[in-house]
Every structure is written in structure tokens, then in C-alpha cells.
């Protein structure tokens, strides 16, 4: 699956980058890491602003497309080990992005521990994920796929991040 085939998703990615870069004053001294970065569809918008990026993408064929498009990409599944490797390579992040990745994670605690390791003390993480309550309330069962390990409520996600020493400060629907 290549995210860049969806015009509406590309527009969403551009709007997100414009908002987050302006709101948190990201610049050429910032470092942005996207987990499950796909073909670089989102990170290319940071690159256009001169902001250093790194994608972490487990699918080698998809990561190769990102690399061909000039997006610095590491082929790996993200978790504590990958985060330690990246910090050893001087890739502590001002911003970590995870869009629609939580459902694919087999060990949520290892994943969130990795986020905490990779994040600079003053950095922030943004996560987009399907909300379990909306899935049930609006009968969105067509969003359930066999490759998803879990679907989370907002409360469950908040508790996991809190347990790993991170504080939630903004939510959008």
C-alpha cells in the first residue's frame, strides 16, 4: 500500500505539516521522525521546508520508494531497540509522528518505550489512530483488517503513554 495514491490523504498530510511546523516553530535545526513512514508522502512536506527528516518503515519495497524520492528512511520495525540505534546515530527527535500505526503494533509497551527513548526532552509526539468508540458507535467495522493487532480507546492510549512518563496536552477529532 502506498499512501501517496490518495489525493485527500496527501492534502491532509500537507495541512498537518503546515500546522505543526508553524505551531511548534520547527526549522532546519529540528529533527522529525515518522514511524511507519510509507513512501515519504508526509515527510516530503517537511523536506520542502528544509527540516531534517527520518522515516522508519518496515516494508523494504515501500522504503525504497521513499529513498528514491529523497526521503532519508531506515528499514526497521520500530520499538525500543530501533530507538536506541537511532539515538546512537544522533537522531533524537523534536517531533515524532505516528499515523495509523498503533493498530499494527504487536507490543504496544515496547513501541511507546521506543518513542520515549527517541524523543528529545522538549519534543512532542503526534499520533493519529482510529478510535474504538467511534468504530463501534458509527458501525465502522469496514475499518477492521486482519493485519491489525488491536483497536484502542482514547483512555487506553492515554494510560499507556502516561505509564511511560509522557503527558497528553491536545486532542483533535
Model-predicted regions and their roles:
Residues 94-97:
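A conserved beta-strand element that flanks and buttresses the S-adenosyl-L-methionine
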Residues 26-27, 87-91:
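Glycine-rich phosphate-binding loop signature in dinucleotide/nucleotide-binding domains
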Residues 109-124:
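A short glycine-rich, Lys/Arg-flanked "PGG" loop and its adjoining helix->strand segment in the class I
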Residues 70-85:
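Conserved SAM-binding strand-loop segment of SAM-dependent methyltransferases
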Residues 166-173:
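Conserved S-adenosyl-L-methionine
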Residues 99-101:
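Short catalytic micro-motifs in class I SAM-dependent methyltransferases
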Residues 127-150, 154-156:
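Short, glycine-/aromatic-enriched active-site segment of Class I SAM-dependent methyltransferases
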Residues 1-61, 65, 145:
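Extended interfacial segments that mediate partner engagement and assembly in macromolecular machines
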